[in-house]
């Protein structure tokens, strides 16, 4: 492809509304253009990347025995009412009526549609297991679409659904999809972690997320430095301390703390570390009354863990300021675990403390020198906090590190949730009707593109992994419009490279070399070949590798073989 015939409109300025680097570079590099909030047109350069991601996914899914289908994006409300999700889904589900006043939605996911298909097509256990996938546009009416294609309203997704006669068969396909996803992200060239995850609204009991590691990631993941253990922070278990609590040394004291409301303010005011403070949170209980949760001041409440406690309402709801005052006779900044007439659950780390500080349930006052068992009863305990760097790994091997991740894939063992709701059954070997066990497996295809940029860029632009780069090679003739020899050689090499199977972008624009070089760095083409009068005098072409900046001269004699040798050379990251 020649740039003079290509839609390539790069910019030097960073768009004001582009918050993260992938959004900035995709706009500046002419990969996407915004149509409306959360809606983007993929330009030719971006579409080449998107299609390469698609092709890798398709090849690996086909290799795993999955069958490709294409289901309607528009779905009738009747199917969603069968599972109850028409009522359960919020405003992110785009609903509308046709001319006959029948309700439909633009599908954000396809569990209902595929289950309806399978209950009509598959009758016997002999047809199982079966795994079907599609690569299709979805729509979720995000309240605040942001970050470009990272969190858009319309997005491209690979979603797969497997059906099984029993849980054993489901587990086998689930493990196969886990390995397939690992191969997909390896082939794309991403550094990622597969982590245990919460099943959320989709349901089921077992789930893993696949996260691309990047500083801009919205999710926190925990992984061991000595084993393969990895989990979303919301699921990573914080093990109880093994040391015995220290013996109390202080006496209970009531301290005036006017205007000191946060843990940071209290610890500074009392001149003690936040790890020796207790923070108390009031939440709605499952039986209607409030429940108090106590944590160390330097720890964060884990909502997923808390709402799984039988005493706590699910989803987690914090008490209102009015409820807090009515229960504790104090505002939120002055409440504590002492003297409460409601159930109290303390995190394992909080129970380990001695001589700690906490709110006194009196406005503007705190206790110091507080000890469990002496000044207040020993509480019920549970793991209700987020893990932190340095915590012991739950598998007993090594310690945990916390990193930011971008979720690009999610797999679930759904069990019989949808098949029972929609009466999807088959006959087993005895002729008895059984509900199908089901798995679902998603990859955010357009999100993978953005995540790859978040992980692979520098101050000059994108550094695409070679497997998904829009072109393999950028061919840059210097002043070809002034030099017949340079133009002739660039045209010849362009033809030879294409014939040899290379994907080549020939930049034949009449621009200054510095501008062209900057554009090629911006759009991230892995390898650059520069043809100049000086090089031709030496019968060479300059070769530069985008990833590590390595440059060398390649002889025009046996040019293709010399280039292939350079492409196979090891890369040292900067």
Swiss-Prot record:
Entry's Gene Ontology cellular component terms? cytosol
- Tell me which domain of life the UniProt entry assigns to the organism this sequence originates from: Bacteria
Keywords attached to this entry: Aminoacyl-tRNA synthetase, ATP-binding, Cytoplasm, Ligase, Nucleotide-binding, Protein biosynthesis
Gene3D superfamilies, per database record:
Anticodon-binding domain (3.40.50.800), Bira Bifunctional Protein, Domain 2 (3.30.930.10), YbaK/aminoacyl-tRNA synthetase-associated domain (3.90.960.10)
Question: What would you give as a GO molecular function for this chain, any one?
Answer: ATP binding
The record's subcellular locations are: Cytoplasm
GO BP annotations of the record are:
prolyl-tRNA aminoacylation
- Which family does the similarity line name? Belongs to the class-II aminoacyl-tRNA synthetase family. ProS type 1 subfamily.
The record's domain comment reads:
Consists of three domains: the N-terminal catalytic domain, the editing domain and the C-terminal anticodon-binding domain.
State the PANTHER family in the record: MITOCHONDRIAL RIBOSOME PROTEIN L39/PROLYL-TRNA LIGASE FAMILY MEMBER, PROLINE--TRNA LIGASE
Q: What is this protein called?
A: Proline--tRNA ligase
